[in-house]
Amino acid sequence: RPRSAVSGSEDIEIRGSKHLFLRQSLFSPKLRHWIEGKRSQWPNLVTSIALKWLDEGLQDRGITRDLEWGVPVNAFEWGPNPEGALPDIEGLAGKVFYVWFDAPIEYIAATWEWADAQAIEAGRGPAKDEDWERWWRQPLAADVTYVEFMGKDNVPFHTVGFPCTLIGVNERQAADGTWSMVNNAPWKLVDQLKGFNWLDYYGGKFSTSQKRGVFMDQALELLGG
């Protein structure tokens, strides 16, 4: 029986809830072509995890949650889509985005914040778009090598979810299934992705949420710092 992970209670109330989904299933052929092209560059662990998701049939992923904390969806602020149609926002009030949908986008936002701080420190005022776009958008980023490091549990979010988001902004699929570029400055996909197996410690993997591992305060104490 389902039960609360917090209290253990089986007094569960089932509620209906409307959510937004990232249509990952549409991108499976494009992702497979991209990932297969990285076999000689990425560790086998990474490509095998990514291709396993595709081989099992890529499912659309819910990208909103009913939580009090998170990046708000704010659907009432949305404008029309590229075809001019307004989205159906009924039932989306109070939703927040799923963390692994919005967190990788922050990689781009962090670059903008860095570029802005650099420009202000240099006395040039706020950053210009090209100051941060040259790291993320083609053709300005043609000379950039983009590398990610992560544990194996985060590989799917960076080989499937985030690439789907970027490809979906860069390209459009026609009714006949063909894709065409619609973004004059397409977002750059990761070049090198290094995924690693978990490090076990006292019978389980290192985990911040479970407080298992050697953390900075403990490391400093061991070093006598």
Model-predicted segments: where are they?
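Structured secondary-structure scaffolds
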Residues: 2-225
